[in-house]
Amino acid sequence: MSISPEKLASAMALRTISHAGKEKQPCIKMADLCRPGLQFAGYFDIFAFERPQVIGKTEMAYLDNLPEDVRCERLERYFSYDIPCIIIARKMKCPPELLRQARKNGVPVYGSDEETSLFSAKAITDLCEALAPRQTCHGVLLDVFGEGLMITGESGVGKSECALELIKHGHQLVADDVVDISRVGRALFGESPEMVRDFMELRGVGIVDIKAIFGIGSIVRRSRIDLVIHLEFWQEGKDYDRLGNKEKTMEILGVELPLIELPVRPGRSLAMVVEIAARNWRLKAEGYDAVAELDRRLKKHYTHQE
C-alpha cells in the first residue's frame, strides 16, 4: 500500500508552499515521519529519507543559525536523497535556500498551522489508516451492544434477514453483503463501500435504504470487528457446540477473531441468539465464563457430598 504526498496533504488540509516538480514523485509507503535535525547537523549515515520530512521549531532554529555556506551545503546534500515531501509545522516560513532546493529537485513542500508534536501524531494516525492492509469479505457487519459483529455464511442462509431484525431491535448497520476490512495495528475495522453504503438487499423485496427507513441512528460508518458469527444450514448428525467450551477462530489479515458457528433451522430466532452471543462474548472478554462458573459449582457440589 502507498499514498501520494498530494493525497496526504489534501487529507490533512495542508497548505501547498511548493508543488512537486517530478513526473514520478516518490509515494509514501511507511506510516512514520522523519524530523531531519541530525541531517541538518551533517549526519547522513542513518537517514529515513523515504518518510515524510517534518520540520519543526528546533530544526528550523538550527538551520537558521548555520553559516550560509554550511547551510547551502547541508541542504544540497539533504535534497540529493529521494524525499517524498517536506512539511513545515507551526505556520513557520520556508527558508529561501530550502525552497530553492525543493523546487530544483521537484520535492513538494507543505505547511501546517499545528504544533509539531500534535501534527506528527495526527499524521501518523492518518498514515496508519491509509497504508493499512485491506481485504474484502462477504457478510454483514453490525454494531451490537457496542461490539462489532460480522455475520457470515453462504448465500440464502439469512444473513440480511437476521441483520434487519437486529436493526429493528435498535442495533446499527455498518455494511451489508460487502465488508471492506482494514487492519490498524492488531485491530480490524470494517466499513461499507461508498457505492452501496446504507443499502441492504432482501430477497423478495429488493434493495432497501436502511437510513431512510429507520433513521440516521440505525447506521454507523465504521466499526471495529470483535466477533464473527457464521450462519450455516442445520446439518443432521453434525456435532454442534452445546457448552460453549470449544473456542474457534477465524483469521483475517493475520488477526485471529473469535468465531461462533450458529446452525439455522426454521422458526429459530436468530437475532435473539446473536444478541445473547454478543453479550456472552463481552462477559468473557471481561473475565466471566459461564462454562467455568458451572464447572466450579459442580465441583463444589460434589466436594460437599463427599
Region locations from a protein language model:
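Structural motif
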Residues: 51-54, 84-87, 107-110, 148-150, ...
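Charged, amphipathic alpha-helical linker segments immediately N-terminal to NTP-binding catalytic cores
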Residues: 82-85, 91-126
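Glycine-rich phosphate-binding P-loop
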Residues: 145-174
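Conserved NTP phosphate-binding and transfer environment spanning the P-loop NTPase/kinase superfamily
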Residues: 226-306
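Conserved nucleotide-sensing/catalytic segment adjacent to the nucleotide-binding pocket
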Residues: 175-233
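Flexible, charged surface loops at secondary-structure boundaries
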Residues: 45-49, 78-83, 143-144, 222-223
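P-loop NTPase nucleotide-binding/switch module
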Residues: 126-146
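Gly/Thr-rich phosphate-binding loop signature of adenosyl cofactor/nucleotide-binding cores
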Residues: 1-78
